[in-house]
Amino acid sequence: MARYIGPKLKLSRREGTDLGLKSGVKPYDVKTKKSARPPGQHGVSRNKSSEYSLQLREKQKVKRIYGVLERQFANYYKEAARKRGATGENLLAMLESRLDNVVYRMGFGSTRAEARQLVSHRTVMVKKAGRDEFVRVNIPSIQLQDGDVIAIQEKSREQLRIKNAIELATQRGIPEWLDVDHSKLQGTFKKAPDRIDLPAEINESLIVELYSK
């Protein structure tokens, strides 16, 4: 399955919620005021959604939020199921611990897609906990561990898009499981988030039910 490159707002309309795919400069409800219905020729279906369709839709929504493709998402689920604790919560914690997501959460990218691009272009450096030196990386899916430090490389620090992203992040707020110093353009991954720290609009139990069949 190829990565979707079409209109981002269309995906949010399809899921009926803001997936965080746009920068957030203009509120989601304003952007969709004239197009509140799901995209497509026929708009809203009158048929009641089946249990399976609800489960599948929730999986699609989470995949789109984090920009993860089908096979990769399935691998995340398998790993989450092997860990101790609630599988659904483990899954979300792993997705939130991805490098591209953390770059976004820290405010260095206005969207996860932009954060992913920053990583792919080797703009981001990571210093593993207990190490002394930063290493430039280009793999967005790197799983961060407690104490890992992220920084923007020196020559990229004046990029306008990074400055704009930081301004948006100050309005959005930084999660408590991260420690960020925007003046130094770096931050620390303190720990993986707990469920209370994660998006409330996600119903991970539907995804667990889907994969448990």
UniProtKB/Swiss-Prot annotation:
**Which Pfam families did the record assign?**
Ribosomal_S4, S4
Specify residue ranges for compositional bias: Polar residues: 44-53
A cellular component term from Gene Ontology for this protein is:
small ribosomal subunit
Query: Does the keyword Transmembrane feature in the UniProt annotation?
Result: no
Q: Which domain of life is it from?
A: Bacteria
GO BP term (any one): ribosomal small subunit biogenesis
Q: Which organism is it from?
A: Psychrobacter arcticus (strain DSM 17307 / VKM B-2377 / 273-4)
Q: Where is this region: Disordered?
A: 16-53
Molecular-function GO term, any one: structural constituent of ribosome
Ribosomal protein among the record's keywords? yes
> What protein name is recorded for this chain?
Small ribosomal subunit protein uS4
UniProt keyword terms in alphabetical order: Ribonucleoprotein, Ribosomal protein, RNA-binding, rRNA-binding
